[in-house]
Every structure is written in structure tokens, then in C-alpha cells.
Amino acid sequence: MENEGKDNGEFSFVSDGGAETGRRGLPKIHTEKNAPTTERDICHDDSTTPMRARTLEHLHSLQKKRSTPTTPLTDSQGVFSPVSEAERQKQQLISISASLASLTRETGPKLVKGDPEKKKEAHKASVLDHLHFGEPILNLSDSALKSTHILYNPSPAELYEQAIKYEKGSFITSTGALATLSGAKTGRSPIDKRVVKDDTTEKELWWGKGSPNIEMDEHTFLINRERAVDYLNSLDKVFVNDQFLNWDPENRIKVRIVSARAYHSLFMHNMCIRPTAGELEDFGTPDFTIYHAGQFPCNRYTHYMTSSTSIDMNLDRKEMVILGTQYAGEMKKGLFSLMHYLMPMRQILSLHSGCNMGKNGDVALFFGLSGTGKTTLSTDHNRYLIGDDEHCWSDNGVSNIEGGCYAKCIDLSREKEPDIWNAIKFGTVLENVVFDEHTREVDYSEKSVTENTRAAYPIEYIPNAKIPCVGPHPKNVILLACDAFGVLPPVSKLSLPQTMYHFISGYTALVAGTEEGVKEPQATFSACFGAAFIMLHPSRYAAMLAEKMKKHGATGWLVNTGWSGGSYGSGNRIKLAYTRKIIDAIHSGALLEANYSKTRVFGLEIPDAIEGVPSHILDPINTWSDKDGYHETLLKLGGLFKKNYEGIHTYQVERDSELAEEILAAGPTL
């Protein structure tokens, strides 16, 4: 190398005996060894492949590829088979437009598939003009002149984007869950729930004293439906979920949920059964539709309305309307009420229960009200979880109604509930929780928004979930009661009439609080352990339960997870370790081999010994130092049972008065 470029400093760059210089004498640098002379005015970087995009807009369009259409259906009986992708999308939109049709104007909205914020031209098959369903009797409204954008079965990732961008109060937590707020209502509003009373439901449904069903007429329902549909059609976009209920393929129900919030769409994506792409192609017309317009109030001056909130169900039209509440649990429990009507019509028993299965195929059902340990005891690492809340029992066995879990989060900890803790990750909806503003770590002990904090996640997030969520006929039916009076045995074997009696009663006790000076436990009863959701008389569900238990040889058990040695305040809570030993003995069949004796008043059969459980606690009288106090409290609880049962025994179970009398006789004797 030779120094020839004095103006360039100490060094110059020489090629083939001479230095190449630019206009100002600076050396040119080539990264390509044999760069053509025509390109020597450009500095090349050949360390990466050339960029294919010409503009930023083009680059962003390359980031996402269009979903590949699934293989066209070959079954000629398929709703959309076999048709082009464009025609299939058009038929989907026609079905959705029919769902959103105004009954007054008899038209459906003009639909566009996709996010309205996307400026690119819509695919020609994804646009549908408003359709007339019959001759219009009024002029079109302004909403008919605009397009309603449909986000159809969006993925969790898409719903995260929608929620965070457009819904105030939506955040990603430190574990990846979506934290959101349900607005003013942080729980269900049972006093605002209405069911249309018509010629059919008047005869079939349970009305009157003790019933959760509050009537409304069809005219009022249609007013609220029109209000909800008009609100949804006025929006720039709505979310549409087409999903299933019931894992039993022979008895599954197709449901459509139309909502205004990404939060509601993701919640139902998690809670209902998620269809495959092929199942969506053949989805067709839904069996039931929910119109969730919860951000818009009902007219409280409309007949049957008592507030700005109304949750209305029309079983004849197969529709549900939600106005004035954004609490997502209304959709879940509304569909559960629907199943409590539809399934018994098919001779299938719908149940508010947990369900698990042993490795040998033995299935157990767990019934229990809040605080009885239903979730804790049905979640067993040695057994498969079929479901935590809603089930059906058909001739095929048991099946979960849902595709997800809706777990309470208050005071949640990794140590107590590791499965729920670990399920709170990307895709999970966290309702009304409080988190650190910087780290986004959730404080599950915080109750400043509500005590009813919840997590909704797919059941696949539970490691030992059984997928598909079905199982054989149950061997054991376990009724859980948290008896704060301290007089029920830790476990009792029930006869069939006793099982029906305690199933209809649905007993537990609320622990005394400090409010209003309450110092004693309070008994609470919820028929079939879910009175708020049943549609028929409790005795009809009990009769079906008895028939199935008798046919398949299931055994009934009453397990007290409450107090022993005295009532709340003087006795002690039965140790969870003892209750788990009892449940294990039920699962293994060991309790069937035990010797039994009968208690007074309730006539319950109690075992004399259980491995791992102190024998003296099995008969509650042994744990009370005040024997007179025990007998007095026992009679008091028996009286509360009898008072609760008044009126129910007059109903003829499936027109079988003898069966009704057997159930009544299985109650306490005072």
C-alpha cells in the first residue's frame, strides 16, 4: 500500500494499484467485491436480503397473511356445502343480518365483515347490503343507511387489540391476562330477569312462590328486543360469536352471541365450546341468540320493568336480550337457564355441579352452594376434571355444558389454588380486579371494586382437564353442605328418597357476620343447588336424578364441610384434610363396605370408621360437650328444613304422588 492521498489523512484505499476517490477526494467503500462500475455511486450493504415492500403501507400489509379457507365440505347435506369461499361468507352474513333484523322495519342491517378502522377495500364477498325479511311496513331508519361492521368469531389476540384500543379500563396484566371492568353492575341482577309467559311456558315452567322465573309478555319482550337491535345496529361494529353448548355431540346446542364489547366476545369465546373452522362453515342458523346491548338501558317505564336493567328470555323465539348491565356472567347463566329448559325436554338432566373422573373411569358429581368446597374438592390432581360448574346427564353419560371455567378470584393464591392461578395467562379475562399501575401485578385480596372478582378461561388451561369433556355414568353423587350449626355428620350415606330430598333442599349455612348484630348462623336453601337458574319445578329435576341414579347404580352422599363440636363461634371447622380423606374413601368404594348407624331427626346413616379420619367426629354428638345444646340445635335445623320444604311436596313429581310422598318422608322427623 502506498500513501498518495495527503488531503485524505494518513491512509488511502488502493485497488489495482490506484486509489478510487470521490468528488471531494474521499475514498469510495464497496461491500461487494465486484461491484459494477454503474453502481459505484451507491454504498451497498449485502448483509441482509432485499426488502420486498416499496412503502410502509405495503410493509404493514405483508405482516398479516389471509387465513387459508378450509377444505370445502363434501357432505351434500351441509348448510353451506360445497360452495366457494365467497359464497360461504355471503351466506354467513345473511344469517347474521337475519339475526340483527328489525322486527318493525323487517330489515337486516347492511353488513361489512372486518374492523371498520381498516382502510383497505373490503373483499367483495364480505359486504352485504341490507336485506328485507318480508315487506317493510315503515321507512328505513338512518341506521339502515350505514354499514355495520361484523367481527365474526375473532381470535383472543384480535379481541385484546380491540379491547385495549377502544374500551377504557382494559389492560394486560403481568401474566398476560386481560383485565377489564363490567361497569356499574359487578354481579348478576336476578330481580331484573324476565321470562316470556305464553301458552307453552305457562304450563311447563315453574311459576309462583319460590320460583326464580318472573313473567313478562311477548309484546314487552319485542319492545326490548327492538331497542337492543337498534342500539347494536347504530354502532360502527359489533362482535358475533357462533359457538356450541354441551360436549355431547348428539345433544349440543348452537348459540350466537351478538355483543358490543370485545370483553363480552372474549368472555363467551372462553366460556362456550369453540367450533373448529370446519364446524363454522356448517354452522348455519343458530338454535339460540343472545343480544347483549348492556351499555344501553331499558326503558324503565315499559311494562314489567322495575329498573334500567332487564335480562329477558323468550323460549319460543329462542332469544335473549340484555339491557342495562355489562356483567358478562348474565350471558353464561342465561344460557344455563336455557339448558335447564331444553335438556329435560329431551329426557336429559341438567345439573349445577362439578364433575371429575378417576383413572379407572369412575365419575363423581359434586353439588354445593358457594363456600361449600365444590371447586376445591372436584379439582383433584389424581382425577380428570370434566367440568367445574354445569353438566348434563344423558343416556350417553355425563358431559360438560361449557368450554371454560368462571372462577372466583378473591383472595386467590398460588398455594391454595395452583390450577386457577396458573390458568390466569394470555386469553384469560379478569373481571373487576385491582392491579399495580406500573408492574400490572394483580392484588387478589383487593376488594375496592367488588368482592366478586372473577377469571374466565378455557378449560384446556387446566392441566388435568379431560378433553373432550365427557364421561361415563356417575358412580357417586356428592351433596356438599357447609353446616355452620355443627349438627350434620361429616359424611352420610343417603337412600334414594333422601338424595332427592336434600337435592331439592339445596342446604348450606351462611356464617354469621357483624352487620346488624347477627350472632348466629343463617340457613340458606337453593333448590337443586342452583335455584336461580332452574326453569322447571325442582321435583322434576329430582325425579330425573333419582331415575338415573337407580338405573346406573349411583350412590348418594351428604358431606358436611362446615362445623363440628359446636356451631360457628364455639365449634371448629372440619379440617379439609379429613374431608379429602372422606372423598377419597367415596371414590375408592371403601365407604360402601363400612358399618353404619342411623342418626336422630334426619335419619342419616353414618359410618363407624374411615381411614385417616378420627372416628369420634363421625357422629357429631360425640364432639359436643353440651349435649342438650346439640339436641336443641339439631331440632332447630330440622325445623328450618321442614319450613323450607313447605309447598314443594304438594307438587306431584311427574304426576307421581307416591314418589312425592317418599321424598317428603325422607326429611327430618321432629
From Swiss-Prot:
Disulfide bonds: none annotated. CDD domains: PEPCK_ATP. Its EC number is 4.1.1.49. Belongs to the phosphoenolpyruvate carboxykinase (ATP) family. HAMAP family: PEPCK_ATP (MF_00453). The keyword Cytoplasm applies. It holds the Pfam family PEPCK_ATP. The keyword Cell wall biogenesis/degradation does not apply. GO terms for cellular component: cytoplasm. This is Phosphoenolpyruvate carboxykinase (ATP). Cotyledons, leaves and roots. Residues 29-47 have a biased composition (Basic and acidic residues). GO terms for biological process: gluconeogenesis. Its main location: cytoplasm. It catalyses: oxaloacetate + ATP = phosphoenolpyruvate + ADP + CO2. GO terms for molecular function: ATP binding; phosphoenolpyruvate carboxykinase (ATP) activity. Residues 1-48 are annotated as: Disordered. ATP binds at G368, L369, S370, G371, T372, G373, K374, T375. It is found in: Cytoplasm. It is an enzyme of class 4 (lyase). SUPFAM superfamilies: PEP carboxykinase N-terminal domain (SSF68923), PEP carboxykinase-like (SSF53795). Pathway: Carbohydrate biosynthesis; gluconeogenesis. The lineage of its organism: Eukaryota, Viridiplantae, Streptophyta, Embryophyta, Tracheophyta. Keywords: ATP-binding, Cytoplasm, Decarboxylase, Gluconeogenesis, Lyase, Nucleotide-binding.
